[in-house]
Regions:
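Active-site signature of alpha/beta-hydrolase-fold catalytic machinery across serine-
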Residues: 18, 71-75
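Gly/Ala-rich beta-loop-alpha elbow adjacent to hydrolase catalytic centers
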Residues: 61-65, 69
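Short beta-strand immediately N-terminal to the catalytic nucleophile in serine-hydrolase-like folds
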Residues: 59-61, 85
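A conserved short beta-strand
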Residues: 78-86
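Short, charge-rich binding segments
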Residues: 52-53, 61, 74-76
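Structural motif
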Residues: 2, 56-58, 81
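Active-site catalytic motif of lipid deacylating hydrolases and related acyltransferases
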Residues: 1-54
Length: 86
């Protein structure tokens, strides 16, 4: 199972580096904010391109990233685990 992390608005891989290194496996950082996505269709298309047909995904989201992760989990059957952080 591949793990992905979506941080809050304005965050980047450096903000979550220490947290992600504490986890027991590799976690890939996703940054939807740099793409200036305008709607749900663009968000879903971006996510589909990022996950590259994984069979099973754990999606971790923090703050606004948690809201996005929750929505994406409801739209993609590949997301089998969802972790929301505040």
């Amino acid at each position: 199972m591949k793990k992905y992390f979506i941080g809050g608005l304005g965050s980047n891989v450096y903000h979550s580096k220490d947290f992600l290194q504490e986890l027991d496996s590799q976690v890939y950082f996703l940054n939807p904010y740099e793409k200036h996505l305008r709607d749900e269709t663009e968000l879903k298309s971006w996510f589909k391109n990022e996950i590259v047909e994984e069979e099973s995904i754990c999606l971790i989201g923090h703050s606004l990233g948690g809201d996005l992760a929750r929505y994406l989990a409801s739209e993609f059957y590949e997301v089998t685990k969802l972790i929301l952080l505040d």
